[in-house]
């Protein structure tokens, strides 16, 4: 059998730090970000289905979110101000991402490629799937800002404001529910979130 470097590459996502131009109280890597996005995207899909009459595959949404930044193992995490400096740079970066996604897909053994390709290639996502993953991605970046600000790091003030605008642009009923039910706890200490359910 031919060896594949696919998972060896994905394992290196933990070596790529997010927010590279910002001073962080706690550094966040792409691997842990992807897990959080998967959990939040799954929740958004479940909320959409249970509360607002949606009919999306929540487990697939979680998988798409797990792999949504996989190409960054080849491209790195380009800072947002650079990535979106102008439309030409944004367009070129999208083309680079597409090449990186295809390179990852090509690493997967041929007999498994049809399973992994639709998870890695964002062009295979439906509009609804893409929307839920993007909502979760923005929500997790917003939560990171809240955590940094709570730790006294004002470096994230402008990022929080920018992300509030992004969340407003991507607003949905399931996001409103998540913001109302789950986000307030991110402003609390461990003691405060633990007092109702001590071990």
Curated annotation (Swiss-Prot):
Q: Which residues form the HD domain?
A: 30-142
- In Swiss-Prot or TrEMBL terms, this protein is called 5'-deoxynucleotidase YfbR
> What is known about its subunit structure?
Homodimer.
Please name the CDD domains in this protein's record.
HDc
- The protein's site described by Appears to be important in orienting the phosphate for catalysis is found at 18
Q: Which gene encodes it?
A: yfbR
Q: Describe the task this protein carries out.
A: Catalyzes the strictly specific dephosphorylation of 2'-deoxyribonucleoside 5'-monophosphates.
What GO molecular functions are on record for this protein?
Answer: 5'-deoxynucleotidase activity; metal ion binding; nucleotide binding
Q: Which UniProt keywords apply?
A: Cytoplasm, Hydrolase, Metal-binding, Nucleotide-binding
EC number(s)? 3.1.3.89
């Amino acid at each position: 059998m031919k060896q594949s470097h696919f998972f060896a590459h994905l394992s290196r996502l933990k070596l790529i730090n997010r927010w590279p131009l910002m001073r962080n109280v706690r550094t966040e890597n792409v691997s842990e970000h992807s897990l959080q996005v998967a959990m939040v995207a799954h929740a958004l899909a479940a909320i959409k289905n249970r509360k607002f009459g949606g009919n999306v595959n929540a487990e697939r949404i979680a998988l798409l979110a797990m792999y949504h930044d996989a190409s960054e193992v080849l491209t790195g995490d380009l800072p947002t101000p650079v990535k979106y400096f102008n439309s030409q740079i944004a367009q070129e970066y999208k083309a680079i991402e597409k090449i990186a996604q295809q390179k990852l897909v090509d690493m997967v053994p041929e007999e498994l490629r049809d399973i992994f390709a639709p998870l890695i290639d964002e062009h295979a996502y439906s509009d609804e799937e893409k929307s839920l993953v993007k909502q979760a991605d923005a929500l997790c970046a917003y939560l990171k800002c809240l955590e940094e600000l709570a730790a006294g790091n004002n470096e994230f003030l402008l990022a929080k404001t920018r992300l509030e605008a992004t969340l407003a642009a991507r607003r949905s009923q399931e996001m409103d529910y998540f913001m109302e039910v789950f986000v307030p706890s991110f402003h609390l200490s461990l003691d405060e979130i633990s007092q109702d359910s001590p071990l």
